[in-house]
Design a protein with these regions (language model features):
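Conserved glycine-rich cofactor-binding loop
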Residues: 11-12
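Conserved glycine-rich Rossmann-like NAD(P)H-binding loop of the short-chain dehydrogenase/reductase
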Residues: 24-38
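The beta1-alpha1 cofactor-binding region of Rossmann-like NAD(H)/NADP(H)-dependent oxidoreductases
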Residues: 50-61, 93
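Substrate-binding pocket helix/loop in short-chain dehydrogenase/reductase
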Residues: 87-88, 95-100
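Active-site helix of classical SDR
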Residues: 111, 147
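Residue(s) in the substrate-gating loop at a strand-loop-helix junction
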Residues: 131
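C-terminal helical subdomain
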Residues: 171-172, 189-227
């Protein structure tokens, strides 16, 4: 039976790989890059919505629109995220705010928005794509680390709250991957030994396909060369 799955940050990288891996379902990808959204939507033949997850008003409207069209959202995958690296003293306040907004506030906004319909049905799955930085802090990534530690705290707290309503929440903690997240942050870090996003997407699929009475509170995945 097809499930309705919303994936934030779905226009590239891991988000796109997840959409492709789960494409036998009703997939709706979200991103604030409309050009890439349209391209990936055509490639994967999936639905999409332009949505900036840092704008809670836009998030509410987007989620309501999806629920109105599909009747329900079975799974939310909070994947959108950005990297911020460098000495804190040389980091602008705008970049600090952006990192916290995307990595921490964004998943909180989208989770809040989907919970109403999930509460009504007393079922649903939320996967929060965090990071190994939620456990181990990298050097000169102070704000990024803080945003991911915050997400782990949110994840563990919301699990207890919503499990009483029949909703499952999984914290997903990948190591660094072969994506352009470093490049977009202005970092030329070599990601060639990182995880292939296709392998990470298969791990997400495993969580999605678990039996209804099984919950995976936390799931970590790393490339063996970087263990």
């Amino acid at each position: 039976m097809k499930k309705t799955i919303v994936i934030t940050g779905g226009s590239e990288g891991l988000g796109k790989a997840i959409a492709k891996q789960l494409n036998n379902n009703e997939i709706i990808i979200l991103s604030d890059n409309e050009e890439k959204l349209v391209k990936v939507s055509k490639e994967l033949k999936c639905d999409y919505r332009f949505c900036d997850v840092t704008d809670y008003g836009q998030v509410d409207v987007t989620i309501k629109d999806i629920v109105d069209k599909y009747g329900e959202i079975d799974i939310l995958i909070n994947n959108a995220g950005i990297l911020l690296a460098g000495d804190l003293t040389e980091t602008s306040y705008d970049r600090i705010s952006k990192c916290i907004d995307v990595n921490t506030k964004g998943p909180i906004y989208t989770t809040k928005a989907v919970l109403e319909s999930m509460y009504q049905r007393e079922e649903g799955l939320i996967i929060n794509v965090c990071s190994q930085a939620s456990f181990d802090s990298d050097d000169f990534s102070t704000v990024y680390n803080a945003s991911k530690w915050a997400m782990r705290g949110f994840n563990r707290s919301i699990q207890k709250d919503v499990s009483k309503k029949g909703i499952k929440v999984t914290g997903f903690y990948p190591g660094f991957m072969q994506t352009n997240i470093f490049k977009k942050a202005g970092n030329d870090y070599d990601t060639s030994t990182g995880l292939e996003v296709e392998k990470v997407a298969k791990a997400i699929e495993f969580i999605v396909n678990c039996e209804d009475d099984v919950i995976i509170p936390e799931f970590g995945i790393k490339d063996i060369e970087n263990y």
